Amino acid sequence: MSDIAERVKKIVIDHLGVEADKVVEGASFIDDLGADSLDTVELVMAFEEEFGVEIPDDAADSILTVGDAVKFIEKAQA
């Protein structure tokens, strides 16, 4: 797992209080990890702060899984 993926995983665990083994690439924040719409907004804000990237609202709407977040951040930092 990449450094970005590890950091995303830690943020998700900290914000949602889920077990580490549930935070996998294909895990949906809402369907698999129990996040609600406020949780997803808070996650996006945490990703922006942690990685120093801006995630526009339209992009945030397409970040549905842990893997989506990792891919967006990797692309934004490239």
Swiss-Prot record:
Residues 2-77 form the Carrier domain. GO terms for biological process: lipid A biosynthetic process. It is found in: Cytoplasm. GO terms for molecular function: acyl binding; acyl carrier activity; phosphopantetheine binding. SUPFAM superfamilies: ACP-like. 4'-phosphopantetheine is transferred from CoA to a specific serine of apo-ACP by AcpS. This modification is essential for activity because fatty acids are bound in thioester linkage to the sulfhydryl of the prosthetic group. Belongs to the acyl carrier protein (ACP) family. This is Acyl carrier protein. It comes from Allorhizobium ampelinum (strain ATCC BAA-846 / DSM 112012 / S4) (Agrobacterium vitis (strain S4)).
